[in-house]
């Protein structure tokens, strides 16, 4: 209904997750709240330690899947999407990114309020992210297709040292400790982050 702001509270991989192969979608007028207020530094550091233990135990039957500490507010998973509009939402207290799209094209993110994201993840995420954008129809022209505008974004920062089980090939960092258990830096946590787009995009 006009003027209503339905609230979605989540503690898993995402508040609103757009499934693979879903395109031409508008997500508008929601409040999405993650579990960040229920987590503290000791819990998040213990989760990072557990992630390292599971990743380095050489036991293929164990894997890390604690999405509680990295869940995203509104995102497209890791599948490609195009022609998506995310507008007039309030997204907050997400442990991972508030709004994120990977491998996507023709994305509009506008007039959202985003705050208190990324506090408890060791995955080096940021509040609003467009990662590895691709031209889904091969239209590598001068058209502006990925638009982030009119958002209010604040108090989004990482508190936990970066660790990742496997770096992407295009990470662009030559530090041998980057993202390993020995890495002692807190990484990323920006308000808006556009990264690693397809070279021909």
Predicted features along the sequence, with ranges:
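Right-handed parallel beta-helix
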Residues: 5, 10-194, 199
